[in-house]
């Protein structure tokens, strides 16, 4: 059974728990090299730990190249819009299979998301696809109107998609202290 959650809040809680246990996070930096228990960042900063987890989403393959390992992934772009205090707020999640749209209540907000566009690592917004998501949501939930979506921030993100649809989870061969966690696509 699917159940709603706020991904931002979930990840914040997960991060806080990991930091309490000694994990370190680095954002908006370029990984030059991943070694067995070490990471070299652009600019020379080096990090070391008991283990390194390579979880770079659609960019995991480029991060793992210094390990002499190929992790074939392709970015699958999806879009979402979040309405605060919408005119209609369903109590349950809905997956609109034919339209490939998900409707998710999150407290007093409603997240409307969908599509899968194989696009490399292009995060640009295709407004035609966004309008398709809005149209499907308004068709299935007549209380919603296209006007409610005017001025609402359009968001795009990349799902890391593996060729067979299965995630990469586990240790890198020959590297005792390096794990990969990526390729989860729509799981």
Where are these regions (language model features)?
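Helical element adjacent to the flavin cofactor pocket in flavoenzyme catalytic cores
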Residues: 1-43, 47-50
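Central helical "cap/lid" subdomain
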Residues: 42-90, 126
